[in-house]
Amino acid sequence: MYVYDEHDRQMAAERVAQFRDQTERALAGELAEDEFLPLRLQNGLYVQRLAPMLRICVPYGMMRSDQLRRLARITRDYDKGYAHFTTRQNVQLNWPALEDVPDILAELAEVEMHANQTSGNCIRNTTTDQFSGVQSDEIADPRPYCEIIRQWSTFHPEFAFLPRKFKVAVNASEQTDRAAIQVHDIGLQMVRNEAGDLGFRVHVGGGLGRTPMVGPVIRDFLPELDLLT
């Protein structure tokens, strides 16, 4: 599990301060709704039927105990005492007050959590098997590769305003697809070639939206070093 360094902590604090200023300007009428919309979406904030909804990032479904306790306290202090775990392994608060969201993000930053790029047309949280790292049938632990994708895609300027949201999943089991990779925009199945080298079988174009589709294989073996290329 990735641990913040000083650069990460500083960037998280600056991001919270920036959004606090944007929220205050929006509440004061200095930012129009169409101006505030892309700013709040980049920080995980939706407004549904006049009620804000905040989606909090849980990278590849992993949380420490202190993070879970902080989430529990936030739901008690700022919401209705409960939260919603999503199919992309994130957490949603459905009743926060708009003016409280910067404070929520500040509290999340204290335990190395955020809501960046959990909403809007960007690369969403990369998901994997909920039992990754402990399954006996894994080819290798998929979580480091999910983290590589997360670091590469977060704040990448080319991925901030995509035509639609984009979803990636990684599966490491040879027997069972526990990450549902064939219904993702990119699905990566970890495999080994005849020489024993680690790589990925690549599925693309899957989805469960308006026109459901099983993603076909476009490459049987992609070397792990070429994952981002």
Per-range role (PLM):
Residues M1-L54, D66-R70, I74, Y78, ...:
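Iron-sulfur (Fe-S) cluster-binding modules
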Residues T118, H203-G205:
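Non-cysteine beta-strand/loop elements that form the S-adenosyl-L-methionine
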Residues G205-T211:
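Short connector loops/turns at beta-strand edges and beta->alpha or beta->beta junctions
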Residues E24-L31, A51-D197:
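Small-residue-enriched alpha-helical segments and adjacent helix-cap loops
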